């Protein structure tokens, strides 16, 4: 598992904000977003979770994340039944990408490996911007999580 660096284009996403301990709130956000997606028959893009807080610095009950999926650039949020849902644009830029499999539910270890070992070894450092997970498989059906962790970066 090594870090690769890519220049990414901006991407539009739609989703829902969750606040609280990640292990509880992110699955709830996934269920809510999936129900909304099915109700509105929105084509399902890449499934992502955007993280806005560091669990080492923010109390669990205040942790913020956005459970989202990518949509077309011209997507318009339905006016009915979309309360609590929002459109965002993930910024274009340089990203470090770390591909991992989580089979034991220990996301904290994987993120720690990324920030404490793999990212520093790459010669890049995080910058203020976006960090998120891109889910690459059907996690519930497979029983594990294949994902890419993305972080905006600059050359160290």
Swiss-Prot record:
Q: What does this protein do?
A: Inhibits the supercoiling activity of DNA gyrase. Acts by inhibiting DNA gyrase at an early step, prior to (or at the step of) binding of DNA by the gyrase. It protects cells against toxins that target DNA gyrase, by inhibiting activity of these toxins and reducing the formation of lethal double-strand breaks in the cell.
Compartment list: Cytoplasm
Query: What InterPro entries does this protein map onto?
Result: AraC_E-bd (IPR010499), DNA_gyrase_inhibitor (IPR050908), DNA_gyrase_inhibitor_GyrI (IPR024911), GyrI-like (IPR029442), Reg_factor_effector_dom_sf (IPR011256)
Acetylation: present as a keyword of the record?
no
Q: Which GO terms describe its cellular component?
A: cytoplasm
| Subunit architecture | Interacts with DNA gyrase.
Q: Which UniProt keywords apply?
A: Cytoplasm, Stress response
Q: What is this protein called?
A: DNA gyrase inhibitor
PANTHER family with a match to the protein in the record: DNA GYRASE INHIBITOR (PTHR40055:SF2), TRANSCRIPTIONAL REGULATOR YGIV-RELATED (PTHR40055)
One short Pfam name that applies is: GyrI-like
The family annotation for this protein states: Belongs to the DNA gyrase inhibitor family.
Work out whether the entry's keyword set contains Transcription regulation.
Answer: no
Q: Name one GO molecular function term.
A: DNA topoisomerase type II (double strand cut, ATP-hydrolyzing) inhibitor activity
């Amino acid at each position: 598992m090594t870090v690769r660096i890519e220049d990414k284009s901006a991407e539009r996403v739609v989703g829902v904000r969750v606040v609280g301990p990640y292990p509880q709130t992110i699955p709830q956000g996934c269920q809510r977003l999936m129900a909304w997606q099915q109700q509105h028959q929105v084509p399902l893009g890449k499934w992502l979770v955007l993280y806005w807080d560091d669990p080492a610095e923010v109390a669990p009950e205040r942790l913020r994340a956005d459970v989202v999926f990518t949509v077309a650039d011209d997507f318009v949020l339905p006016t009915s039944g979309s309360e609590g849902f929002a459109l965002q644009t993930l910024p274009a830029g340089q990203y470090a990408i770390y591909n991992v499999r989580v089979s034991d539910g220990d996301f904290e270890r994987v993120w720690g490996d990324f920030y404490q070992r793999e990212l520093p070894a790459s010669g890049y450092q995080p910058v203020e911007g976006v960090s998120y997970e891109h889910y690459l498989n059907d996690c519930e059906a497979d029983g594990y999580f294949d994902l890419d962790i993305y972080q905006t970066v600059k050359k160290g």
